[in-house]
Structures are given as C-alpha cells and as structure tokens.
Amino acid sequence: MAGHVTAGFAVCVSGFFYLERPFCYGAKELYLVVNFVLLVLLFVCMIYDLKDREVPMPLTLGGLVGAGVLGLFHGLWSPVLLTIALTHVADFNPREKRLAFALTLSAFAGIFQPDAALLCAVILSIWMLWEFGIMGGADVKLLIAITIMIGNATILIPIAVAGGIQGVIASLRKQREIPFVVSIFCGALFFVLFPLI
C-alpha cells in the first residue's frame, strides 16, 4: 500500500492533493497546457509589439524563466544553463571575449548533454543574432524560450517561413521596421495546430 502512495505521489508532481484517485496530468495534457500557455504569451507579446513596437520586459523574461523551469522539468538542464550563462556573457567586453566565451560555453553544453547539443547550437545561433544586432532582445528571449519550452528546434522552421513572408510583404509596402513577434506567433501557432489537423 505504501508503494502505491509513493508511486502516486511521484507521478502526481503537478501539485494536486492526493485523494481517492489523484488527478495528474499525463504527457498529452501537459503538452496541451504548455502549448496553450505559450500561445497566450506570444499573442499578448504580439499585441504589444504591434501597438507599441516594444514588448515589456516582464513578459519576455517571465516567458524565459517559465521555459527554463519547464526545461529543467523535462531534463533539458544543459540548454537552460547555457541560456543563463549567455545572459551573463552578454555583459563582457570586448566583443571578441564575449564570442569566445559564448562558443566555449556552447561547446561544453553540447558535450555534457549530447541529446541537447542541437538545442544548444540553436540557442547560441539565436544569441548571435542579438549579438550582431540583427534581432532585438525581446525577439531573442521569446525564440529561446520557445525552443526550450517545446524542446524541438524544428519549431523555428515555420517561424522563419512566417518571417520571410512578413519580410516580403514589408518590403513591398516599403516598411523599414517589422514587428517580428507576429511571425513568431504565427509560426508557433502553425507548429502547434498542424499536428491536430
């Protein structure tokens, strides 16, 4: 009997009380909840980006922290620690020192957790886009949060396609600034909804 209670408690880590039958999220339910929360966060960020051309720091930082907690829960400790390390490396001067530290940390992150080496390389690539001024800080934080939260780098493919379409439309309209969170939301929405179709 004690083994069943312990097993029930171990399975029911979501914080619900153990009564007769514990209510625990299965993998499918957890996946749906995570995707819903992700899409709501991205939608709110998109509204701010369209309205003010700026996403508030608490939204992006909250998303990044939430993704880190979820990543640790799923065993993606190396990408989470790499993200934390890259936020600290961003303050180093000169740029050569930042880049050397970032590359070294990413290599070690990939070595220590080979299953997550691709995610670490993607996180480094996204950070480099910010480092060279190609992308804004809010966009980078959201992309890293999405990559860790989903745990699959292929989510960036529909985001890149949506960004390309948005870029073509912006160039036809002679726009200089593009609210990229729109592409992030549309790509993530497609990635989440496509398997359900």
Listing of model-derived features with the role each one plays in the protein:
Residues 1-197:
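A membrane-topology feature that recognizes alpha-helical transmembrane segments
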